[in-house]
């Protein structure tokens, strides 16, 4: 992937130092103050999520879809553990592309996922991709043998270069997920979703300690979906063959 110089971004007196990156979203390596003030260790909570930078930062996430903040020196009490694990036989719900908060009356505006400083590295990836590109990619990558009568018109539409109407995308994705869950074993399903990641242009970079990923979750123009992604086949198909660092999560527009 070719590295490109990103356009400058300013949040009040603070200027994010952006990584050279041409993939999905923006990657912030550090913050710099135009007046030369030192940057707080936890620049996410002490600068970006505080007024007057808070709303411009949330708007930046809405616009970019994904903003990655590197080298954040501390966590915050509002973070909570990301729970859920997968098994040898079936995928857990977290391995399917999803928005957060779908079961509630209103989805959160932004989802933050944090890899805290810890003794054990995080080996399992998190894939983040635009919606409804995830739905179109799932249709394209669906094996022909799994195209049911319900999915056939949507599959044909996708292969012909058409787009599923946004109002129908949740329905179609639900049909796809049920088909995958019913007809593919766990490792075949993981291989399928790896292909979906690539087609949808997912962000799947390795986690680093002190990294936060801010994901637009409710923006009608630039919303994202995410999933837990096993990028390597584990011995005997088992995903838990090595120690794996944990992740934290919160909904910063509502909780921070």
Model-derived regions: residue spans:
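Short, solvent-exposed coil/turn segments at beta-strand boundaries
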Residues: 62-64, 169
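Short, flexible, solvent-exposed loop/turn segments with mixed acidic/basic and small polar residues
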Residues: 56-60, 102
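Short, hydrophobic/proline-enriched secondary-structure or compact coil segments at domain edges
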Residues: 65-71
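Surface-exposed ligand/attachment interfaces on beta-rich extracellular proteins
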Residues: 51-54
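Active-site environment of non-heme Fe oxygenases that use a 2-His-1-carboxylate facial triad
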Residues: 4-19, 26, 30-37, 41-43, ...
